[in-house]
């Protein structure tokens, strides 16, 4: 995805999608602060009160090929991020790790699936053959999102979580 795109949510709200930028580090920190403890725990596999400056900089620095991330902007405050999806691929690997965080008030409205479909397009363009996500078993929302992609998937247990592998070929 180059530039910006508009995604219409299930309730008719329009949100802008775009690639993450280096200057988004502070907005990513605010997204984590606004998210519930449960949402943060499901994303980071444990409590996290604050996204460190180092983590925020890492998450907002992408190369568009092996590290790629897309964000959804708050329709009422276009400086604020309300959702982020990302993949990260090790050099030379066929697959990339996928992760997402959607602000609670925007969950179940279509941002997660909309961002993920755009991320999959970018992953395919960059030669990523599969995405994998480590998902806690009680994260029904993420498991449902991944299954709703209607792509071939494989499940296995890894490091205390479900590893959901989505085939992009």
Where are these regions (language model features)?
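Long, contiguous binding/interaction regions
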Residues: 1-169
């Amino acid at each position: 995805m180059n530039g910006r795109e508009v995604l219409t949510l299930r309730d008719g709200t329009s949100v802008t999608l775009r690639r993450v930028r280096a200057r988004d580090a502070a907005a990513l920190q605010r997204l984590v602060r606004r998210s519930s403890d449960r949402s943060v725990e499901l994303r980071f596999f444990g409590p996290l009160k604050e996204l460190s400056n180092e983590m925020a900089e890492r998450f907002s620095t992408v190369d568009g090929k092996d590290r790629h991330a897309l964000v959804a902007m708050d329709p009422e405050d276009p400086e604020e991020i309300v959702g982020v999806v990302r993949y990260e691929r090790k050099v030379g690997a066929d697959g990339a790790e996928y992760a997402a965080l959607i602000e609670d008030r925007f969950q179940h409205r279509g941002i997660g699936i909309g961002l993920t479909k755009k991320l999959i397009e970018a992953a395919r363009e960059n030669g990523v053959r599969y995405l994998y996500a480590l998902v806690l078993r009680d994260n029904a929302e993420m498991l449902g999102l991944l299954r709703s992609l209607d792509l071939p998937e494989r499940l296995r247990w890894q490091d205390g979580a479900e590893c959901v592998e989505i085939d992009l070929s």
